């Protein structure tokens, strides 16, 4: 009898604990939900589609969005890049840091400044390596880099040199523009290759990017560039509010020339008043802790402005 009594008490306690735990979870969920839905006002929390313009432009060339296919392709890129908020905020911040340097080179090379957005979608403005082996901001393959005069070996990889790789991209884009008569097709060729674009033009008897049936990646390519261009140029229109103080600051640097080997980059950096990390951030194309340079080639090194 006594054991039965205590057994009932134990069951009652377990039931009470379960009720209390359920209540706590319910309240916690309600609080979390309320906080997520903008301070409890659920009517203020909405996700909206993006208004698609009737026309978009890239490098001074207009694309009229007058077909369902074109509208849906443009809509996809606007939606993906608007609602992948964390990535797009990073892209906007990095654009503030690197675009001034890239724009100067594009202008100097006679290439429309809209092409800075090509680098943005290629790499996110990071020195990344693709599964196929393309490297740097402009995602240059080893064969292409060497063809256009970049030094690429175990000691130096100039695909990571922003100045030289941007100038290479400009040479390629101008060559493609001369071949196809269109900056838009030049951008497509940067992704698909000039031969690939030429084959599509000949097989389909079309000369406008938007009228050519490309594979999935290339058919998205220019529309992705255009979407990021619109978002970065007018972030508030897409719901991105970033204070100027939160932007990544442009790099201020000067250049020095060197035509001899560097036996130890750590010591070399220290002599300039830098640590190894900061020196390599500005000169990522130097792959090792030394520079061979037996040929006495003239290299250009980037040094923080306050260290000159």
Language-model features, listed with the residues they occupy:
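Catalytic cores of secreted or luminal carbohydrate-active enzymes
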Residues: 216-239
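Extracellular LysM carbohydrate-binding repeats and other cell-envelope/extracellular binding modules
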Residues: 282-308
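Solvent-exposed, acidic/flexible segments
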Residues: 84, 88-99, 108-111, 130-138, ...
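Primarily a LysM-type cell-wall glycan-binding module
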Residues: 244-273
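An acidic, Gly/Ser/Thr/Pro-rich helix-cap/linker signature
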Residues: 2-110
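Short, functionally critical alpha-helical segments immediately adjacent to catalytic or ligand/cofactor-binding
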Residues: 111-126, 186-192, 280-282
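Substrate-binding/active-site groove segments that recognize
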Residues: 133-154, 166-168, 173, 197-200
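Catalytic and binding regions of secreted/periplasmic enzymes and modules that target cell-wall glycans
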Residues: 173-200
